[in-house]
């Protein structure tokens, strides 16, 4: 689909990978609204890119329903995620271990439920940003890998509900397959693993191959939205040296 004048809502779009996506969407003519907590970062973003902004907690169920009811987006990107506490399995408290579930999965549940129950209009697309940790785990990040895999599952479950109710909404998972320095999650993860392995964070992330800075990530997500060959798949891996690859096809 062409993104020109499409109404797009991006959660967690004020920094990191989300910001790179917002920049790419604006460059392709989309009308973007960014939902995030930090008012100062949102103010700066509004001035620099001309996007609309809403300061809100993405785990606030009431705010979630209000925002989608008011904006009725053509495309919804659920990118917001908390930086997980790092440490080995023998070090993390239950609160630290479950932090990604309390934030990322809770937010995903509320936004997906709102998209299904309002519902969004037929033809809408919802992208759920997961992580490469959903494929291989992340032993230094507690429950993070499991939380990101759950979001992938939830996109699949949401498609099932959409099909059963004949809503015409497509849900897809976006899976960045490498850590990206300059992002909260990427910096925390790379630092933790690099320290454990006795190397610098830059050396650790080099193991993933070609880098994928936030704007490049954004361009790859735009290609998923814009290229018809990605319209039907369920999950797509994004990587600097391999581009976009389908990880899971949509259920027949």
Identify the residue ranges that each predicted region occupies.
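Catalytic loop of short-chain dehydrogenase/reductase
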Residues: 125-165, 175-187
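Conserved glycine-rich cofactor-binding loop
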Residues: 14-15
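C-terminal helical subdomain
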Residues: 194-251
């Amino acid at each position: 689909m062409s993104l020109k004048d499409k109404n797009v809502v991006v959660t967690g779009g004020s920094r990191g990978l989300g910001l790179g996506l917002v920049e790419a969407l604006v460059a392709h003519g989309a009308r973007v609204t960014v939902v995030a907590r930090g008012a100062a970062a949102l103010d700066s973003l509004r001035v620099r890119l001309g996007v609309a902004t809403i300061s809100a907690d993405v785990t606030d169920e009431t705010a979630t329903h209000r925002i989608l009811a008011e904006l009725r987006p053509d495309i919804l990107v659920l990118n917001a995620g908390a930086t997980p506490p790092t440490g080995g399995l023998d070090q993390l408290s239950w609160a630290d271990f479950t932090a990604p579930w309390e934030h990322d999965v809770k937010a995903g549940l509320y936004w997906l439920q709102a998209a299904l129950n309002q519902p969004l209009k037929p033809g809408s697309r919802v992208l759920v940003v997961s992580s490469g940790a959903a494929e291989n785990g992340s032993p230094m990040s507690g429950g993070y890998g499991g939380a990101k895999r759950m979001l992938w599952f939830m996109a699949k479950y949401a498609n099932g509900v959409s099909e059963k109710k004949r809503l015409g909404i497509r849900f897809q998972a976006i899976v960045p397959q490498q850590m990206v320095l300059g992002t909260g999650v990427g910096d925390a993860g790379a630092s933790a693993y690099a320290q454990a392995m006795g190397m610098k964070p830059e050396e650790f992330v080099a193991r993933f191959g070609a880098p994928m800075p936030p704007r490049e990530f954004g361009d790859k997500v735009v290609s998923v939205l814009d290229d018809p060959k990605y319209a039907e798949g369920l999950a797509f891996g994004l990587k600097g040296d391999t581009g976009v690859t389908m990880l899971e096809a949509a259920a027949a």
